[in-house]
Amino acid sequence: MEDRVEISLLMDFYGPLLTEKQSEIMQWYYNDDLSLAEIAELNQTSRQAIHDLIKRCYKQLLSYESKLNLLQKSINRKKEIMNFLEHLKNKYSIDDEDIIKYKEKLENL
């Protein structure tokens, strides 16, 4: 089942690997919330053609993720950072403001 958040994240990682037209249509459909009919009208094509293109792009994004795992690695990295910061907070009594600063620094690495 496709989840809009998952697709947006996949687009963040792998969107540049799609063609300009594919990327634009995915952006319109998932981020700008345009309907298939609206996108079809903008592209002077049928709703079915847009639907098929979106499904192909989604499968392509999943294929990239299955091979490269960039999204999953990023999610795992963020979890590890949060666990590490929570450990620091508990062990060394670091306040939340400092934790936020450390988190931002680690995420920018």
From Swiss-Prot:
Classification via Gene3D superfamilies: Winged helix-like DNA-binding domain superfamily/Winged helix DNA-binding domain (1.10.10.10)
Top-level lineage group: Bacteria
Task of the protein: Might take part in the signal recognition particle (SRP) pathway. This is inferred from the conservation of its genetic proximity to ftsY/ffh. May be a regulatory protein.
Family: Belongs to the UPF0122 family.
UniProt name for this protein: UPF0122 protein Cbei_1174
The species this protein was found in: Clostridium beijerinckii (strain ATCC 51743 / NCIMB 8052) (Clostridium acetobutylicum)
Top-level taxonomy: Bacteria, Bacillati, Bacillota, Clostridia, Eubacteriales
